[in-house]
């Protein structure tokens, strides 16, 4: 697992208060991890801060799963 993937999973587990083992790449923030729309906005902001990057609104709307976040950040962070 990449460093980015590990960091994303840790951020998601901490922000949503879920067990780390539930945070899989296929897990939907809303359907599987119990997030609401405010949680997803807060997650995007946490990713931006942790990875020192900006996630445009149109891109943020496509980040629906843990794997989506990892793929976006692997391509755009740093």
UniProtKB/Swiss-Prot annotation:
Modified residues (O-(pantetheine 4'-phosphoryl)serine): 37
Keywords recorded for this protein, A-Z: Cytoplasm, Fatty acid biosynthesis, Fatty acid metabolism, Lipid biosynthesis, Lipid metabolism, Phosphopantetheine, Phosphoprotein
Pathway note: Lipid metabolism; fatty acid biosynthesis
Main location: cytoplasm
PANTHER family named in the record: ACYL CARRIER PROTEIN, CARRIER DOMAIN-CONTAINING PROTEIN
Function: Carrier of the growing fatty acid chain in fatty acid biosynthesis.
Domain of life: Bacteria
SUPFAM superfamilies assigned: ACP-like
Any one GO biological process: lipid A biosynthetic process
Classification of source organism: Bacteria, Pseudomonadati, Pseudomonadota, Alphaproteobacteria, Hyphomicrobiales
InterPro entries according to UniProt: ACP, ACP-like_sf, PP-bd_ACP, Ppantetheine_attach_site
UniProt GO MF annotations: acyl binding; acyl carrier activity
Residue ranges of the TM segments: none
GO cellular component: cytosol; membrane
Localisation: Cytoplasm
Record keyword Protein biosynthesis present: no
HAMAP family: Acyl_carrier
Protein name per the record: Acyl carrier protein
